[in-house]
Amino acid sequence: MNKKIWAVFMMLSYSQWTPKKDHLYFDDNYWDEFLEKCHDTGINMIVLDVGDGVKYESHPEISLKDAWSRERVHSEVEKCKKLGIELIPKLNFSTGHSYWMGDYRRMTSTKPYYDFCSDVIKEIYEIFDGPRFIHLGLDEESYITSRVSDYVIYRQGQLLIDDIRFLITETNKTGALACMWHDPITENVEAFTKAVGPDEVVIFPWWYWAYTNERPYKLITDVEDMYANRGITCEQDVPIRVNFLKNILPLMEKGYKYIPTPSNFYGVEDNTDITVEYFKNGSPSDEQILGFMTAPWLTTTPQHKEATWESLDLLKAAREKYYGK
């Protein structure tokens, strides 16, 4: 069996969740301490949410004032390599997380937008010294997740699938393999599988609620309330849950490969153990599980050390429990 990926998601830029920032939320000293912790807990990959956090030559207008230079990125890639860690860039082309694009966010699905996407994908591959993967994000693109924004935009149906197809093609042309969250796939299984083959993408499923009735836990309160406002009060009736649990394992029968991604962000500490167990036992072949990634969903700053360290320890514990030391 090939060596599993044991990854952690971290942030360089924070402009993917809120209106575009003017600086990084990133502490250099804490980052170095974090890398040592990763090495100590067996992490062999960091997926770094880059966004506008590097200096783009093709689109300098989107880069933050303290964005990393090419030289800085190269030094960090080499630093990680010495610790046995791959540093993988992540962008996010979901309209719910595209503030980092600046004005291009408002040009979604137009020629200037496609040109921009192609440019930054090619450049991020070069900046990160030819990484094995490029993560494209693509989570939480819907009315529900967009409606709190001042400028609401989201794609659906065939347009969404066509844009995903374009992004994957542009990524794989670089030599990297495209990665993405599961969200638009489990909502559009037939259209997605017709458009994108199992060898063209790695899927990162995330799920912070109950996988089975045998191991239930409470739905996250704000999401529960959001659906209650629409007249849906039973967890089993939540559409995103129904579609996820209905489709996520059967997709593997078609040959798609996964890196499932648990989190401790909502205080559900057993999500990591449950996620590793669910996919290890439920996949048709363990070879299709390339590994697992923990996502603390926190800025790379020292006030989040306790929760970030916990996420790493939880992944280590699950790895040792289900895959051995």
Where are these regions (language model features)?
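Extracellular/periplasmic catalytic domains that process cell-envelope and extracellular macromolecules
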Residues: 1-3, 127-128, 194-198, 251-253, ...
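Hydrophobic beta-strand segments of well-ordered beta-sheets in folded domains
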Residues: 4-8, 44-46, 134, 200-202, ...
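Aromatic-lined carbohydrate-binding surfaces of glycoside hydrolases
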Residues: 9-202, 207
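Substrate-binding cleft/loops of secretory-pathway carbohydrate-active enzymes
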Residues: 105, 178-227, 267-284
